Amino acid sequence: MSKIVYLGHSSFLLKGNDYSLVIDPYQNGSVPNLKFPNVEPVDVVVCSHEHADHNARELVNIKDNPTPVGAVSATVPHDDCGGAKRGLNKIHMFDIEGYKIVHLGDTGCILDERTLEPFKNCDILLAPINGFYTIGPRELKEIANIIKPRILIPMHYYMKEHNSGYPDGNMIEEFKKLFPNYRYLDKEELDLDEYKNYQGVLLFR
């Protein structure tokens, strides 16, 4: 069993056969019209950086006997001026039952090929498209052209259907123009085995 469960904003529950983790849980009140959901106990909580919409570790329970979960990471700017405005951010890559899942956190600028080298040809790329606090769709296009993920999933954008997330000028529509090979998922859970042969973009509703 290998699953990605979308928890809203930039947060996900990643589940393997015997281990699980939550990345970037958000403080209640930090993201417009979103409340962090109740989540089963996990082995580890990972935060890309220490902003309130990404670091609510206390909202996630840890298992009594947690399994260590390793990750490949890279520290990058949260902005387009070397971190001077918003500090630094960590990209993480996890191996979930053989699926390589990369989470860009709040990456704030286009990154060079050397920085992105460890993440090339990943199975899943979870990437922000806010365009103000993070990169937007155009910057992501350049990053995706280097990483070449099998599946791209956008995050950290205003979701009109739920009136949730930070206003961003409807970045999801610009994203869909740049990445036209997309498919909407009918639930907030992705079974990776069901999509092991899929290539393209997946969107959570």
What spans do the regions from the language model cover?
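Binuclear metal-ion centers of metallo-dependent hydrolases, dominated by the metallo-beta-lactamase
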Residues: V5-L7, K85-R86, I151-R205
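Active-site-proximal beta-strand elements of phosphoester/diester hydrolases
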Residues: K3-Y6, S20-D24, A71-P77, I91-M93, ...
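Active-site-proximal loop/helix segments of hydrolase catalytic cores
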Residues: G83-I147
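Short secondary-structure boundary segments
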Residues: H49, I129, M155-Y157
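Short beta-strand scaffold segments in enzyme catalytic cores
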Residues: S11-L14, H92-F94
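Pre-active-site segment of Zn-dependent metallo-hydrolases
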Residues: L13-V46, H54-D64, T75-G87, T107-P118
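Conserved acidic residues
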Residues: D43, D123, R150
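Metallo-beta-lactamase
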Residues: H54-G98, K177-K196
